[in-house]
């Protein structure tokens, strides 16, 4: 995180002195401001505080604590500047650069984490209105958000560009930096490292509701590898990698002996090859328009809007994958109150956005990590929360080495 911030600070410090076109200069500075805000946003989500470094520093610099509020204030300042100076879109040669919409989306999310829903709604509404112009919207095929077949589309608000060109050896080959490596770490043992697993409760949650056509939620098939998926999706391929010997229903056979084993399928490259490596070519979507729609629905009810109005935006996300509108679904009772709607919205976000990096921020924003009631709900689904300590584990510890090197300027997070 702080290496990225250091590089942003170099741009923000030295570019103003360069003789160049003024509009282009502002756009360069705005991109650096956006990226610095993105890094600090993540720091606040993970540690609840950090150290605020806004200029290039040398090895002798000793950082000091910055509070969560101080970091949010800097995130807001950087993103307001970015939103003012970034274009709505870029030409083909510059696809992937931060845009005004990306800045407003991240700013809206930052406000939401602080429960400033009025401000968040204002920022997110800009993107909602741009759907009318075609700048943003949901693409027809949900899975295209996780392959290289339809990148930088109208659903993508901000995505990191990756490619598999100039492939080199594994290890520390510099070419690895251009490829998306997550697929290698999450793929099942025997294909990848199997480092990231899903929990069975998420599979069961998907299976609670059928599509209008009677089939299961296609997001499940494309998000999680689990024992029995070929039975739940008989019309989809039983193979999830292009392996010649496909005698077994769920190839490959050695990817897990435990029937509870569930691996992350989202973003894998089984649609074009039989293995994973460090050079996947699919871009990583940081913010999608579907995420914005669900965030906007939350803002509506948190600012005294009606549940019926908010449900329209959730229904857009559900309709895309063939599910009934909320009022016609088994969850229709969620429309009876704000609390019931927000509880259902929590699960709608989980089913749409699992493994995309927003879950922890959601749990913190909803207060589920701060009460025994919230932890009990999480424990009922996920044994990882059995040892969760309220007041401690909502944040990570500050690395002790950094504290030791700070000459007393940095302090440890509570209870560590």
Map each language-model feature to its residues:
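Long, intrinsically disordered, low-complexity segments
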Residues: 1-4, 74, 142-202, 279-284, ...
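C-terminal substrate/ligand-recognition segments
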Residues: 218-319
């Amino acid at each position: 995180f702080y290496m990225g911030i250091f590089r942003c600070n170099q741009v923000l410090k030295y570019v103003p002195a360069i003789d160049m076109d003024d509009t282009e200069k502002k756009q360069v500075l705005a991109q650096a401001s956006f990226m610095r805000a993105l890094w600090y946003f993540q720091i606040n989500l993970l540690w609840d505080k950090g150290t605020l470094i806004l200029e290039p520093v040398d090895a002798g610099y000793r950082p000091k604590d910055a509070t969560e509020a101080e970091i949010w204030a800097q995130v807001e300042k950087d993103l307001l500047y970015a939103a003012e100076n970034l274009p709505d879109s870029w030409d083909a040669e510059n696809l992937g650069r931060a845009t005004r919409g990306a800045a407003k989306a991240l700013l809206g999310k930052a406000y939401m984490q602080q429960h400033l829903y009025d401000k968040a709604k204002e920022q997110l509404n800009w993107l909602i209105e741009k759907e009318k112009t075609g700048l943003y919207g949901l693409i027809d095929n949900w899975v295209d958000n996780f392959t290289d077949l339809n990148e930088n589309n109208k659903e993508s608000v901000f995505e990191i560009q990756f490619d598999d060109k100039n492939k080199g050896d594994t290890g520390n080959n510099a070419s690895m930096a251009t490829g998306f490596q997550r697929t290698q770490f999450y793929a099942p043992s025997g294909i990848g490292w199997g480092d990231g697993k899903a929990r069975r409760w998420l599979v069961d949650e998907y299976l609670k509701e059928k599509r209008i056509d009677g089939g299961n939620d296609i997001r499940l098939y494309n998000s999680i590898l689990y024992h029995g998926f070929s039975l739940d999706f008989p019309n989809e391929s039983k193979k999830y990698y292009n392996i010649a010997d496909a005698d077994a229903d769920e190839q490959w056979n050695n990817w897990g002996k435990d029937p509870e084993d569930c691996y992350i399928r989202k973003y894998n490259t089984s649609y074009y090859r039989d293995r994973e490596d460090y050079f996947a070519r699919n871009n990583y979507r940081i913010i999608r328009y579907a995420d914005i729609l669900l965030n906007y629905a939350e803002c509506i009810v948190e600012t005294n809007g009606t549940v019926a109005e908010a449900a329209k935006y959730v229904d857009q996300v559900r309709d895309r994958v063939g599910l009934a509108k909320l009022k016609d679904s088994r969850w229709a009772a969620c429309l009876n109150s704000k609390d019931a709607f927000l509880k259902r919205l929590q699960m709608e976000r989980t089913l749409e956005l699992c493994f995309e990096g927003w879950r922890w921020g959601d749990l913190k924003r909803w207060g589920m990590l701060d009460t025994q009631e919230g932890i009990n709900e999480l424990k009922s689904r996920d044994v990882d929360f059995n040892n969760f300590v309220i007041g401690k584990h909502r944040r990570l510890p500050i690395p002790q080495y950094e504290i030791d090197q700070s000459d007393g300027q940095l302090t440890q997070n509570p209870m560590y």
